[in-house]
Amino acid sequence: MKVVLLKDIPGIGKTGDMKEVKDGYARNFLIPRGLAKMATEGEIKRIRNEKILKEHKEDLTKKKSEEILKTLQKQIHKVPAKVGGGGKLFGALTSTNLSEILSKNSGVEIDKKWINMDKPLKETGLYDIEMRLPGGVRGTIKVEIVGEEKG
């Protein structure tokens, strides 16, 4: 029996795939649990349309992410911070702080999840920060922590 999968099923296929399975498996397991539907003409057309829309949406997300990354890579982002002796910061620069600063400077909303930092930055200097944006877009931006001497 041909079925269209409504959810990812290990060993069988992914959502939207059309698969040939045994009649009993489809009638007694997949269909009653809402994991698959019988592959009728209408269902096949609906799945194709959903796949096209999903691919189009993913393309738009990727293009938007690439534009955001290009905007961020155009400059070195200076981050003022209060420092003590030896260039050590009072506190630390985290991905949350950095996302707020980048959002303010670039005019584009930057999610803290896009910033890949192993640990918070605690010293002044120039850093390469890895960005992981939606759509599989990756790149690095330059961030310079500039000290404001406490007087």
UniProtKB/Swiss-Prot annotation:
GO terms for molecular function: rRNA binding; structural constituent of ribosome. Gene3D superfamilies: Ribosomal protein L9, C-terminal domain, Ribosomal protein L9, N-terminal domain. InterPro entries: Ribosomal_bL9, Ribosomal_bL9/RNase_H1_N, Ribosomal_bL9_bac/chp, Ribosomal_bL9_C, Ribosomal_bL9_C_sf, Ribosomal_bL9_N, Ribosomal_bL9_N_sf. The keyword Transmembrane does not apply. GO terms for cellular component: ribonucleoprotein complex; ribosome. Binds to the 23S rRNA. This is Large ribosomal subunit protein bL9.
